[in-house]
Design a protein with these regions (language model features):
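Short, surface-exposed amphipathic charged segments that create phosphate/polyanion-binding patches used
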Residues: 60-67, 219-226, 288-292, 361-365
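C-terminal regions of RecA-like/P-loop NTPase motor modules
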Residues: 67-107
Length: 567
């Protein structure tokens, strides 16, 4: 792509200069954008434009470093008699030269386009004529979606050419969209195709994708390439990571990339968005990278310039998270430390509604197509399980010491592990993650602080009364409602739980592997709901697992004895 070609020259030309050597690189006319050529002009010492007609060859110096003469930047004509280039000065000679330029420009009218865009435009033109070759599809999947053979097979099965073109239209830069984005769009296509009722309850997405080439462009344009190479050595893998992380947090984006960021933010207006990691290796078969890379909420309030600065800092945070110690260790332990890990980014509109000054989804969480957490002997693990919370789904993904998500096994969705109201209240979600539109930040609120802005119908779906606690208060002359989060009303909606079970079952069947998903659900007072499928990845399953006979263990050697439960 033009972005990566520009990066090549930005890295190579200074290196050749240090080596005190000379190298010539030919560029084919009309194959690259004006922007790409401008990046090369900025870094090279010498840039020559060469034109050839039937009998004439012209050379036009566009940049000559540290040298100047009165005729240097004139076009020069090649003489076949003596093999010399001489300046074109006469009126006749200049008219022939400009006629040649005009003829050549007619053959290359689209130099405002990236070479990658021209490839897609050509594929689109062929498709309108009823042609879409397997080679073209293979190129698109390889360069944009995934190189994993199992995922490629699924993409070919469920994607149409229109899907590829739509995805490209929503890309910033070029390169791959990464594992998380690929998993999200693929899961949606599978559900749209295989589950008839999915479309009626599916919340459409309007995500953008920052291509993986932008990650390398950011590194190169901030003069971090050699540091990146040093960090990828055995000696520098951990030791150079902190320095590279600091540089990634403080770099600047090229002007053409910033302009595309601004166009995207204008599209979203002041709707909150989330900037999510979507690396090459993320969310593929065998490597989930769960929680290793960052996702950053942008509440997206303020002036366009303020929103752009917040967004750029969020992208920097995601890029820098590739150098987090936990991510480096994860890659090292799995033998991925020598693999090229590039970071693409998935930008999604935050699903939800406004409640006073706060914004959040009705509920959110994660789902597993196979549940290893079985608290009743007759539960069906293959029915799947949901971890569901009120507000943003971070409480379902990131474990906290005070908050407990609601667990729902999908064969008995309303069943709970606790038998008393006191237990249900004690082991419930106490704090809600929301976006504060006044303070322009994500924050955690105690449930009681959020209650005044919640409508009654919403409370009935997500909350329960603690009648025992209310009675104790009444005995002391205190009359007030005591609420706690249970999601019982939502889980009593068989339409919702039935759809979630079908989504999990269908994805596992198509993937030929257990999966986990991230989702949000928004409801209204009529009981209608929409589900937003945010992520899907294959669950890692160990090949070394086996049945263990516990009867041979001596009683004195047992620390914990648990039956029909999980720990």
């Amino acid at each position: 792509t033009d972005l990566m070609m520009g990066n090549f020259f930005r890295v190579t030309c200074p290196y050749l200069f240090e080596l005190d050597t000379v190298a010539y690189f030919p560029l084919l006319r009309g194959r690259h954008s004006f922007d790409a050529v401008a990046r090369i002009r900025d870094t090279t010492q010498l840039l020559l434009d060469v034109y050839s007609g039937e009998d004439d060859i012209y050379l036009h110096p566009l940049k000559v470093w540290n040298r100047y003469s009165g005729q240097m930047f004139l076009p020069h004509h090649f003489s076949k008699k003596d093999g010399q280039f001489r300046p074109v000065e006469g009126g006749v000679g200049m008219s022939r030269y400009y006629q040649l330029l005009q003829n050549l420009s007619l053959n290359h009218p689209d130099q405002n386009y990236d070479s990658y865009d021209r490839f897609f435009n050509l594929a689109k033109m062929e498709y309108t004529r009823g042609i879409f070759s397997e080679d073209t599809e293979e190129q698109i999947i390889d360069s944009t979606m995934t190189k994993d053979e199992r995922l490629k097979k699924l993409v070919r099965q469920y994607f149409t050419p229109d899907d590829y073109f739509l995805l490209r239209n929503r890309m910033i830069g070029s390169g791959a969209i990464g594992g998380k984005a690929c998993g999200m769009v693929l899961a949606r296509k599978i559900c749209e195709t295989e589950i008839p009722e999915f479309t009626g309850h599916n919340e459409p997405h309007d995500s953008f994708y920052i291509g993986s080439d932008v990650f390398y462009t950011y590194i190169v344009s901030n003069d971090c390439w050699r540091l990146r190479i040093r960090q990828r050595t055995k000696e520098g893998y951990f030791s150079a990571a902190g320095e590279l992380r600091d540089h990634l947090l403080t770099g600047q984006f090229p002007a053409n990339i910033r302009e595309q960021f601004l166009n995207m933010l204008e599209y979203y207006g002041q709707s909150p968005i989330i900037v999510r990691s979507s690396s090459f290796l993320e969310d593929g078969f065998g490597n989930a990278f769960a929680g290793k890379y960052e996702s950053v909420f942008c509440v997206n309030q303020g002036s366009p310039q303020e929103r752009l600065e917040k967004f750029e800092q969020a992208v920097r945070q995601v890029y820098a998270s590739t150098m987090n110690y936990s991510a480096l260790e994860y890659r090292y332990q799995r033998g991925l430390d020598t693999r090229d890990e590039q970071m693409a980014i998935l930008v999604q509109r935050v699903s939800g509604s406004g409640y006073g000054n706060y914004f959040m989804p009705g509920a959110a969480g994660v789902g597993y197509s196979y549940s290893t957490y079985k608290w009743m002997p007759d539960m069906d693990s293959s029915a799947g399980m949901l971890r569901i919370v009120m507000g943003l789904g971070t409480k379902a993904v990131d474990r906290t010491s005070e908050d407990y998500p609601r667990l729902s096994n999908q064969d008995r969705p309303t069943a709970t592990i606790y038998s008393t109201t006191e237990q249900k209240h004690r082991y419930s979600q106490r704090n809600i993650d929301v976006l504060d539109c006044t303070e322009n930040c994500a924050r955690e609120l105690p449930l009681n602080q959020l209650l005044p802005v919640l409508p009654l119908w919403y409370k009935k779906l997500l909350l329960e009364h603690d009648r025992d606690a209310e009675m104790l208060l009444q005995q002391r002359g205190i009359y007030r409602n005591v609420w706690f989060v249970s999601c019982q009303g939502l889980l009593s909606n068989s339409g919702f739980t039935g759809l979630m079970q079908r989504i999990l079952h269908t994805l596992e069947k198509v993937y030929h592997n257990p999966v986990d998903i991230e989702y949000t659900v928004n409801m209204d007072e009529t009981g209608d709901f929409v589900v937003n499928l945010l992520q899907c990845r294959p669950l890692y399953t160990s090949k070394k697992s086996k049945q263990v006979d516990f009867s041979k263990i001596e009683w004195d050697d047992i620390f914990f004895d648990i039956k029909d439960s999980s720990m």
